[in-house]
């Protein structure tokens, strides 16, 4: 399990959009994104290097929590909460390989710091 907390200097609504809207996800996570944002919905992420990952949406609580189950094992859970400096994002990933969590961390830091 990998757990990471990051505080973003943006309102919760804006961070939620960055995590759930395909166009916003394409700004910082993957090159092509499709998400059916409802429990049981499908999600797919494609990168320019040819890598592709698929997931199923497990939980959706707008502006609070989003959980995906990766089709190749593991889950990733995003939990948002208010923070004096903006919005706190807690990412918990349970997956045999650490690559997704580490990629997410690097992308998130780039997104915040431009």
What annotation goes with each model-predicted range?
Residues 94-114:
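A conserved amphipathic terminal alpha-helix motif
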Residues 1-7, 12, 77, 82-92, ...:
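Aromatic-glycine hotspot motif
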Residues 20-21, 30, 62, 103, ...:
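Residues at helix-coil transition
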Residues 1-34:
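Hydrophobic ligand-binding cavity/cleft-lining segments
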Residues 16-19, 28-29, 70, 97-102:
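Tryptophan-centric aromatic hotspots in well-structured domains and transmembrane helices
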Residues 34-39, 44-96:
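Hydrophobic-ligand binding "helix-grip"
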Residues 25, 35, 67, 108-111:
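Generic macromolecular interface patches on structured domains
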